[in-house]
Amino acid sequence: MGSFSIWHWLIVLAVVLLLFGRGKIPELMGDVAKGIKNFKKGMSDEDAAAADKSIDGKTVDHKSDEVR
């Protein structure tokens, strides 16, 4: 009872095809792929921006004998 037979999966596949149609499924998968690609690009851009900020850091030396 815990596992599904091949007939169960064929019925599920038929229902999905009826709901979405043949042309809609590749379109949805293409949109998912574009989303993943944009997410990865955004993460790499964010890492590059963080690295640039750490490189641009400046230090200020002060003299300890000066009194305010």
UniProtKB/Swiss-Prot annotation:
Any one GO biological process: protein transport by the Tat complex
InterPro entries registered for this protein in UniProt: TatA/B/E, TatA/E
Stretches the record annotates as Disordered: 48-68
Transmembrane segments: 1-21
Keyword annotations from UniProtKB, A to Z: Cell inner membrane, Cell membrane, Membrane, Protein transport, Translocation, Transmembrane, Transmembrane helix, Transport
Topology in the lipid bilayer: Single-pass membrane protein
Assigned protein family: Belongs to the TatA/E family.
Protein's name in the database: Sec-independent protein translocase protein TatA
Organism listed in the record: Sinorhizobium medicae (strain WSM419)
Gene that encodes the chain: tatA
